Amino acid sequence: MKIVYIHESIAHKGGLERIFVDKMNYLADRLQYEVYLLTASQGNTPVSFPLSPRVRHIDLGVRFHSQYQYRYPKRLWEAKKLDNLLKERAQMMIDNIHPDFIICTTAWKPEVIGLLKGKAKKIMESHCAREYMAISDNFSRGCVRDLFDRYTARTKFCAVRKYCDVLVTLTVSDARSWAKGCKQPILSLIHI
């Protein structure tokens, strides 16, 4: 079985990164699956947690941080170009690997990853309740920015609803939250 994880990077020492690395290591070492980690912008930054040598890490070289050197509206144009580059490079890798499953999060680019073509089932993991996707890290940043944040969250939610085959949540409460408007099977997993 071939499994591809897609994420921006595994450079932060956070809970999501730890869970992803633990799962990839388990699937590769214990269950002997072929596991790939596709990162968009890992670059030369080391992976934040020990990654099994059996997990194949491929960085796609899409530097999303480069869009922040521009002011709006050019920044939006650059962001769209980077999304297209991510889709193009990830699709090339998916075409070469032919995975059975593609795994990503609801928070990072489900609207792009959902468009990848192939026979792979798409599993999206939610590490927060659906309601919290519309809250930016900086909280209120002005009316226009708040509207944009809500639009972005709605786009992600619609992508999850449209493209994912299975949605995985961390708690039963999160599963209930996501169930509103989703027809996909929703699994609730408690990570220990």
Predicted regions located by residue number:
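Extreme N-terminal starter segment of soluble prokaryotic enzymes
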Residues: 1-4
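N-terminal strand-loop element at the rim of the active site
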Residues: 7-13, 26, 30-76, 174-179
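Conserved alpha-helical elements of sugar-nucleotide-dependent glycosyltransferases
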Residues: 15-23
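Membrane-proximal helix-turn-helix segments that form the acceptor-binding/catalytic region
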Residues: 89-93, 146-167
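Short His-centered aromatic/hydrophobic patch
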Residues: 104-109, 126
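Conserved small/polar residues in nucleotide/adenosyl-binding loops
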Residues: 191-192
